């Protein structure tokens, strides 16, 4: 019976009638290597830092770098803790190291045109940042919680919900 189920699932996946969730785990090395990489990137991405001060919450990001476990990263905390540097700089560089091209979007810009739509293969030049984030392999949003309601021909909705639904549907982190 187990073999029949496996065969059925394989056939349905091949016929594109079924999606099997299979999270992609990423790692940028052991804990020491990730710590060194984090510190190097953080310093390079913010030239205003005179002296780097390692904050306790950075250790959680470094743990995620060691093994993402196929999940994304949600950063919450007080102002001035480095969330935007991590979100808009560090994570895109890390993903770039894994050949994943991403663009971090500020939450205020969800309904604005995606600036690289014309140069992104297959994208309509009128694509919004919201549409980009629903299609991108690893959506990155800075300043979540300040995003405006989206008005689509009179229908108002929260764009973040569309991004989360797409990520869940397609098994994205």
Please give the residue ranges for each predicted region.
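Conserved lysine of the Walker
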Residues: 83
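A short, basic N-terminal segment
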Residues: 1-69
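AAA+/P-loop NTPase substrate/partner-engagement loops
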Residues: 92-139
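Hydrophobic positions on the alpha1 helix immediately C-terminal to the Walker A/P-loop
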Residues: 86, 90
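Short loop/turn elements that form and flank the Walker-type P-loop nucleotide-binding site
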Residues: 68-69, 133-136, 168-171
